[in-house]
Amino acid sequence: MMIPTEKIRIRLKAYDHKLLDQSTSEIVETARRTGSAVVGPIPLPTSINKFCVLRSPHVNKKSREQFEMRTHRRLLDILEPTQQTIDLLMKLELSAGVDVEIKLP
C-alpha cells in the first residue's frame, strides 16, 4: 500500500452532534466530488464538563442542581488533495456552531 505524500487533517468540534454530522457530510461530499480520497469521519471521544450549583442562595447545601456541557468531536483526513479540493473547502459555508481546525502536516 502506498503512503500518501500529502494530506489535510480536519478536526471538527460542536456542542450539537446533529450540526456536527451535517457539517462533516458536507466536507466529505465536497472532497469526494473533486476526486480526493477521504478517511473518516472518525468519532473522537465526547468530552463532558459537569457543573454543580446550589439551588438556593443561602441555605440547603444538600439541594443542588447539576448541569453538563458535551463537546462532540470528529476527525477527517483528506488524502492527496487537489487545488480544486482546497479551493472548494475554503469557500464552503458551515454552520456557526461548528469549530473547524485544519492542519496541513
From Swiss-Prot:
Transferase found in the keyword field: no
Pfam families: Ribosomal_S10
Any single biological process term in GO: translation
Alphabetized InterPro entries for the sequence: Ribosomal_uS10, Ribosomal_uS10_CS, Ribosomal_uS10_dom, Ribosomal_uS10_dom_sf
Disulphide bridges: none
Sample GO molecular function, one term: tRNA binding
Record keywords, A-Z: Ribonucleoprotein, Ribosomal protein
SUPFAM superfamilies named in the record: Ribosomal protein S10
Gene Ontology annotations for the cellular component aspect, listed alphabetically: ribonucleoprotein complex; ribosome
Family matches, as NCBIfam families: PRK00596.1, rpsJ_bact
Described function: Involved in the binding of tRNA to the ribosomes.
Oligomeric and partner information: Part of the 30S ribosomal subunit.
Identification of the protein by name: Small ribosomal subunit protein uS10
Organism whose genome encodes this protein: Desulfotalea psychrophila (strain LSv54 / DSM 12343)
Higher taxonomy: Bacteria, Pseudomonadati, Thermodesulfobacteriota, Desulfobulbia, Desulfobulbales
Gene name in the database record: rpsJ
